[in-house]
Amino acid sequence: MPILDIRPYHLRAHIAWLDDSGERPHIAIANGPDTVFPPAWKDQDMVVFNIDSEAVQYCNVDADGITFMARFQGQPFEVRAPLNAIQWVASQNGAIKIPFPQLA
């Protein structure tokens, strides 16, 4: 049996830990061919999203990456990003910033 990628487990754990600690988790996502950003940000190299449970809906982390629904300029939009696009997870104020491991 192959070893599973540990990154989705780390990401879910970091998000839950920040949330349980009373922090609002934020995630930095690098733009790339498999990343889906709101149209206003499609030209940005990297975007930081508030992924607190009050800010997004249907946040899902799995072996394919992260997806969540959020409102941008009043319109719902599904953000999608592969695991390799995730740069870091942090608290809102930046006091806690956890770099996310990349695979070659």
Where are these regions (language model features)?
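Eukaryotic intrinsically disordered, low-complexity regulatory linkers and tails enriched in Ser/Thr/Pro
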Residues: 1-104
